Amino acid sequence: MREPLAGTQTLIEAKGVSFAYGRQPVLEDVDLEVRAGEFVALVGPNGSGKSTLLRVLLGSLDPSSGTVRLFGEPPSRFADRARIGYVPQRPVLDSEVPATVEEIVTTGRLARRGWWRPLHRDDHEQVGHALDSVGLGDLASQPLNELSGGQQQRAFIARAFAGEPDLLVLDEPIAGVDAESQRRFRDSITHLIEEHGAGVLLVSHELSAVASDLDRVVVLKRRVVFDGPPAELAASGVSLGVHPEDLPLWLEELR
């Protein structure tokens, strides 16, 4: 088992980040930081720039201005990508690849351990735990391309869990899943943070399952309009830019 990360270590950091598609600004002067052991939620209305910000933070897009650091390095220089587990909202799957769910999840473990190192008993156990954490243990031997879109996304979440990343970045990972799957998801997040000191950045509209575990909530509307503990958001009067009846249940519960 590897040593937990130091709680003061900054895993991902953005300073003064702006981004535009052509002349259309999407992000404006965004500051964001996630440290080891932190569980941070990124929320905001549709079109607020959340998914774009994730892509900028991870180096898929270059900011128009400002700086980004992954583990202290510019994304273009950060080579140890196995330290990061990233699950986009809509993972891209090659339908011609006949891999099973378990095989796909195992690649997450291999990426972290080293592709040419044999897997040991604890590695296979971690893959099994990851599958169970997203409710796919019974479907481990099924071809991934035969699963529904939601099940495929859960398989990629399990792949990220199997690698026990130092930084976990998730874009809408629990939309539409049942309460039991949400509980398992929460337990896996808690394990990563408590046992390994991992940092977690979560984009989601459905945070009721994890609201009590969050350290910070960041509200994005092209720029950061709030960054602080969930309870302070409920008292701050910051609007998420949606109709009151559409406010997430977790926010209502904090009032």
Language model features with spans:
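Helix-to-loop junction immediately C-terminal to a conserved catalytic motif
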Residues: 58
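Conserved ABC transporter NBD signature motif
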Residues: 66-80
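Conserved ABC ATPase "signature" region
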Residues: 121-139
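Conserved ABC ATPase signature
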Residues: 143-147, 151
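Conserved catalytic motifs of ABC-family nucleotide-binding domains
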Residues: 164
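Catalytic Walker B motif of ABC-type/P-loop ATPase nucleotide-binding domains
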Residues: 168-172
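H-loop (His-switch) and adjacent beta-strand-loop-beta switch element
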Residues: 216-229
